Amino acid sequence: MRIQNTLCALLLLTLVGCAAPKQSLYQWGDYENQVYSLYNDPGKSPVEAQIEKLEADYQKARSTNKAVPPGFHAHLGYLYFQAGKGDQAVQSFQTEKALFPESAIYMDRILDKTKK
């Protein structure tokens, strides 16, 4: 009986181990590393390089029909603002607000600040 229980447990573990990994809802790309490096070591990589990486991640997400994570467009807008690209920053903030309505109050405050 004990051998039978052990075999059943091993079979169950084998089947569970072979299960397909759960698909992520978002295409994260290098976004998490970008945010981490921005706050952990500011100035390490130029703003333009960060923008290029995030734009490439965005294109990859679009090509795979996945959504970008919450905060992605807000972060990209922040980088655009730092680079002096105000129009693109506003567009990114508005996109973040449209995609994630729970961020509307925060995005409205940022949009008001960019107008000043």
Task: Go through the PLM ranges and name each one.
Residues 75-76:
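Structural register within alpha-helical repeat arrays
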Residues 25-28, 67:
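Residue signature of alpha-solenoid helical repeat architecture, marking inter-repeat boundaries
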Residues 19-22:
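Bacterial signal peptide processing site
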Residues 36, 40, 104-116:
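TPR/TPR-like alpha-solenoid helical repeat scaffolds
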Residues 14-17:
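C-terminal motif of bacterial Sec signal peptides marking the signal peptidase cleavage site
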